Amino acid sequence: MTLNKMLFGGGVCAAALLAFSISAEAKRARCFTSDDGYFACTYRAIDDAGSFRISAPGYPTYVLEIDGPGFAYGYVNLGRRNVPLPGQFVRSHDDGACWYNPQTNTKLCAW
């Protein structure tokens, strides 16, 4: 293998690693929950399906795990453990950043 090919291959690997690490980083967002209203938060993608976690100092941490396209189950962490939220969340047709739980009439958004 020539030095140029080795350098090119190493550069491609480094770029792929950088792109992957950036996508997994937490991002600043504006959040809304029915219980807490609007607040500045941190958004972090959890997996490739679209599951995510939102958190902020002084607020509970919320996790939505995608169950299928447009459907998710939620958890809230109030300190030491995740507590399952009742019912299933449905992605909003009006705003794709929002999820609605028709069984509990609650809403969670992250922009």
How should these model regions be labeled?
Residues 1-11:
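Bacterial N-terminal signal peptides that target proteins for export
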Residues 25-111:
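Cysteine-centric segments in proteins
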Residues 19-23:
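N-terminal signal peptide c-region/cleavage motif recognized by signal peptidases
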